[in-house]
Regions:
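Alpha/propeptide regions of enzymes that mature by internal proteolysis
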Residues: 28-50, 57-117, 131-135, 199-201, ...
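Residue-level structural signal for beta-strand termini and adjacent loop
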Residues: 9, 76, 138-139
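Gly-rich Lys/Arg/Thr-decorated short loops/hinges at beta-loop-alpha junctions or inter-strand turns
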Residues: 13-24, 69-72, 192-195
């Protein structure tokens, strides 16, 4: 027989969005923001410890607006950028009214914009006085974050803990104070802890430097 599809919701009206911006200045600032993201990548590559980040270049850097929407990115790993904004918005949602200058957050939760657990995201707000203007964020593939097997994320996992350490909304830097001991505790205090927390910490330091 025939399958008949009947629309029950009105088709959304699509209107072209105009702009009064100077196209020259728009392009200038577009390239300025992209250049910042590229410089973030150079810093991350040059200061990271792991081969994954330093040589394989398995990372991405980007700039987001105060609401977590993507403004500009460098041509790193496009697969990271599709969901990184959700990670920024998760940080905003979970810390509403509590984010301050000098703070940075870490997460790899796939339920909040993460990809697989080895991809760890560091999110840092950019303030002017008391107002958040932007967020800068970078995501890097750490060689190991625990799990049943070295390298993390084994395909036969039946539960998220078997893939590695799940990090959600952890404040890595609190008003300029780097919380290394607490971060090590997160990496080690798990059913399947990270096998080389020292390397994880070194790469997280590089991500902070990039931001």
């Amino acid at each position: 027989g025939d399958l008949v599809l009947r629309r029950v919701v009105a088709r959304p009206e699509r209107v072209a969005i105009g702009t009064n911006c100077d196209p020259v200045m728009l392009e200038v600032f577009n390239n300025l923001f992209m250049s910042i993201a590229e410089q973030m990548g150079y810093t991350l590559q040059n200061t990271a410890l792991s081969v994954n980040v330093k040589e394989r270049l398995d990372f991405s850097c980007a700039i987001f607006d105060a609401g977590g929407s993507l403004i500009a990115n460098a041509p790193h790993m496009p697969v990271h950028l599709g969901s990184m904004g959700e990670s920024v918005r998760a940080v905003l949602r979970d810390n509403e009214g509590k984010i301050g200058p000098g703070d940075s957050y870490v997460l790899n939760n796939p339920y909040n914009g993460g990809t697989h657990l080895p991809d760890i995201t560091v999110v840092t707000p950019v303030f002017e006085a008391d107002e958040i203007l932007f967020f800068v964020a970078c995501r890097g593939h750490h060689p190991d974050v625990g799990g049943k097997t070295p390298g993390s994320a084994p395909p036969d996992s039946a539960h998220i803990e078997e893939e590695g350490v799940l990090i959600e909304n952890f404040k890595l830097v609190d008003a300029g104070t780097y919380r290394e001991a607490e971060m090590v505790e997160v990496l080690q205090d798990a059913l399947y802890p990270a096998r080389n927390a020292e390397q994880n910490i070194a790469d997280l330091r590089a991500q902070l430097a990039a931001n």
